[in-house]
Each structure stands twice: as C-alpha cells, then as structure tokens.
Swiss-Prot record:
UniProt record similarity statement: Belongs to the GINS4/SLD5 family.
InterPro entries reported in the protein's UniProt record: GINS_A, GINS_bundle-like_dom_sf, GINS_Sld5, SLD5_C, Sld5_GINS_A
Record's GO cellular component terms: CMG complex; DNA replication preinitiation complex; GINS complex; nuclear replication fork; nucleus
Keywords: DNA replication, Nucleus
Variant or mutagenesis effect after changing K150E: In sld5-2; temperature-sensitive mutant. Defective in DNA replication
Protein role: Required for DNA replication. Functions as part of the GINS complex which plays an essential role in the initiation of DNA replication by binding to DNA replication origins and facilitating the assembly of the DNA replication machinery.
Substitution effect: W67R: In sld5-12; temperature-sensitive mutant. Defective in DNA replication
Protein name: DNA replication complex GINS protein SLD5
Subcellular compartments: Nucleus
Coiled-coil spans in chain: none
Record note on quaternary structure: Component of the GINS complex which is a heterotetramer composed of SLD5, PSF1, PSF2 and PSF3. Interacts with PSF2.
GO biological processes: DNA-templated DNA replication; double-strand break repair via break-induced replication
Keyword Protein biosynthesis: no
Length: 294
C-alpha cells in the first residue's frame, strides 16, 4: 500500500513549528534538555510493591549489553523501558546525593550530631562518585544517539512497520514515547521537504515514496545479511532444562542449532563460544537474549 503523502503533509501543515516552544519556557523545576535524560523519559514509583528489585550492578551490566547490541546491530532493537526508568531514577538520586555532599548539607548534619565534618582530604570519594556518574551518563547518551541515528535512517521503514498489521512487534515496544514523537516529527518534516522540492513537480504515478517494485527499493531496510560477532550466553533466566531450543552436541556440550539459508546447512552454537554469523541467522536468538553482540 502506497503512503499518501498529501494526508501526511496536511498533518504537518497544522504545526507552525517542529518543536513545541511552550515546553522550552517551563519553570526550572520541570526544565528538560534534549539529551539522554529527556529522550528516554523517566518516572519510577519506588512505592510500587509489584516491582522486582534489581541491583545497580545488574542494571549497569544490562545497560552495557544493550549498548553493545544496539551499536553492533544493523536494525533498531526494542527499547528497554523498565531498565531505562530504573537507571534514570538512580541517576537522579545519585545526583541529588552528590549535590548535598558538595554543598555541605551532610557535613552540617554530622556536626549537629556531634560528629566531625568531612575534611577536605576526604573529598576524593565524592570525585569518584561524580566520575562514575558521568561515565554512566556517557553510555546512556551514546546509546540514545545510536538509536536516533537508526530512526533517521530507517524512517520510512519504521512507518511501514507501524502500518503493517502482520508485524511481530509494535512501534510502542520498539521505541520509547519520546522516540515515537521524534520519529513522527522527523518523518513529517522530511516528507514535506521531499514533496516541496521534488515530488510535486513529477507525474502522479511517480510520486510514490515507498515503491518496492522497481530494481531499487526506495525504502531503506536494515542489512539483514550483515556479518556480526556473537557470544552465546544461553538462557537469560538460567533455566537450562526448560529451554526447548537448547540441545547437546556430540561432545555433550549445550548448544543452539541455527540454519544458514544460503548454504542450507545447520550450525551448532555452543554455549560460551564466539562466532561470526549473518545477522538474519541469529536475530531470533538475540531478541530472546540468548546471544549478545560483541
């Protein structure tokens, strides 16, 4: 089904600007910056007893794994909603703690409790805390920038994916709320530019922007045949006996079996080993968190 560009551009014409200026002029208590802290959005209710506690070490490990997978993957991977909520909440709490320490609030509290204030020589732990916090922010920003670059590159593909009723994953699972807003605004601006510059001067039968019948596909899709390095982790929950895909090879080692379509051959991926495979072959295992890109 062709995308009706006139309907899309009509929606864009209703907006006078690409960015809502009212969000920029809010007070300092709700001021946001277009960095990683804004694009992912964060709100975590610590009083929600239904949530399972996850240690900071586990969250950091999961972030590094998601970061590496995103940078090495040719496609846009699903957004880790709960992980990012927890991480941004931890960053907010840690930033507040560092600010209280740097302004001497904790020193005054210690003095009131007949405890000596922290000497200047003891500020080294504070500097280490700030450095570690900035390192975490760097990884999150790099992760979000990588995702935004893929959103820009595969804008039409994501729009087509959203309109496909047979799609295995929805756009709300693939993107965060702010990423969806960014994708919608970016794609509308791009379509308006292409229409005003080129399409409206061409015959009507040549104005389709998602033609896939010619020799060249007009929709940029991820390179499914890209070679990637993978590390086979095994079941993420540690329940080896309950994994139906897990088998034992001739040496008695647990492994996964994948099929290479071009060669029509089966390959055994042993747990704990490293392989080079086409992304399409290990895509399902990556989605199930049974392999990691390196």
């Amino acid at each position: 089904m062709d995308i009706n560009i006139d309907d899309i551009l009509a929606e864009l014409d209703k907006e006078t600007t690409a960015v809502d200026s009212t969000k920029i002029t809010q007070g300092s208590s709700s001021t946001t910056h277009r960095d990683a802290n804004t694009i992912v959005g964060s709100s975590l209710d610590l009083n929600d007893k239904t949530q399972i506690y996850v240690s900071p070490q586990q969250d950091f490990s999961d972030l590094m794994k998601s970061w590496k997978n995103e940078r090495c993957s040719p496609e846009l991977l699903p957004y880790p909603h709960q992980l990012m909520k927890r991480l941004l909440n931890r960053i907010s709490m840690q930033s507040q703690l560092i600010e209280n320490i740097s302004m001497g609030f904790l020193d005054m509290q210690n003095a009131s409790n007949a405890n000596p204030p922290m000497p200047n020589e003891s500020k080294l732990p504070l500097l280490c805390m700030e450095t570690e916090l900035e390192r975490l922010k760097f990884v999150i920003r790099s992760y979000i920038r990588c995702r935004l670059s893929k959103i820009d590159k595969f804008s039409l593909y994501l729009r087509q994916l959203n309109e496909d009723e047979n799609s295995l994953i929805s756009l709300t699972d693939l993107l965060s709320k702010d990423e969806i807003k960014y994708h919608d605004t970016h794609s509308l601006i791009w379509l308006k530019l292409v229409n005003d510059s080129i399409l409206k001067y061409m015959p009507e039968e040549l104005q389709a922007i998602n033609d896939t019948e010619g020799s060249v596909n007009m929709i940029d899709e991820p390179d499914w045949n890209k070679f990637v390095f993978i590390h086979v982790n095994g079941p993420p929950d540690g329940k080896w006996n309950e994994d139906p895909l897990l088998q034992e090879n001739e040496f008695g080692k647990p492994c996964y079996t994948v099929t290479i379509p071009d060669l029509k051959e089966e390959v055994e991926l042993t747990i704990g080993s490293i392989y080079v495979m086409r992304y399409e072959v290990i895509r399902d295992l990556l989605r199930d968190d049974k392999v990691a890109l390196i």
